[in-house]
């Protein structure tokens, strides 16, 4: 027997995920750019390598802002919650796994690259938000 899910009109979990994503994008741009991109762009790497890194850097900014916007819409629109939880949450989960795995490979610890904590938090908030969307 199938039961219908009664969706809550507003999700504070999706709103929280949107806020964390927005804050993460600000940290990425304000703190990360001078720490990571400035030395990389000042290096003697070939221009094409610098260009690709620059695109990748700004791509992450765009993905974080998109995740924030989609999560914000999903907070108010129940029909958006499953797609956002799966697509944005799945993307953030994979990024967390990358940080943990590559941190372990490069540094024998995930802590030199703690970004996985924020991406993991966003993933958890989106999944809880979807699961608790039923009244």
Positions of predicted regions on the chain:
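Cytosolic juxtamembrane helix and N-cap/initiation of the first transmembrane helix
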Residues: 1-24
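Juxtamembrane helix-break-helix junctions at the cytosolic face
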Residues: 3-10, 68-86, 130-133
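Core segments of alpha-helical transmembrane spans in multipass integral membrane proteins
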Residues: 19, 23, 27-35, 48-76, ...
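Membrane-interface interhelical connector segments
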Residues: 36-46
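Non-cytosolic membrane-interface motifs at loop->transmembrane helix junctions
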Residues: 44-50, 106-119
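Hydrophobic alpha-helical membrane segments
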Residues: 60-63, 84-99, 118-125
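Membrane-helix boundary connector in multi-pass membrane proteins
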Residues: 78-79, 90, 96-114, 127-135
């Amino acid at each position: 027997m199938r039961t219908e899910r009664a969706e809550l009109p507003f999700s504070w979990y999706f709103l929280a995920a949107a806020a964390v994503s927005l804050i993460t994008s600000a940290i990425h741009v304000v703190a990360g750019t001078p720490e990571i991109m400035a030395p990389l762009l000042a290096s003697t790497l070939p221009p094409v390598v610098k260009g690709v890194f620059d695109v990748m850097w700004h791509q992450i900014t765009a993905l974080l802002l998109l995740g924030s916007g989609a999560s914000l819409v999903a907070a108010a629109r129940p029909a958006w919650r499953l797609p956002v939880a799966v697509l944005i949450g799945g993307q953030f989960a994979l990024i967390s796994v990358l940080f943990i795995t590559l941190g372990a490979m490069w540094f024998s610890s995930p802590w030199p690259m703690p970004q996985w904590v924020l991406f993991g938090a966003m993933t958890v908030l989106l999944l809880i938000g979807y699961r608790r969307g039923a009244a």
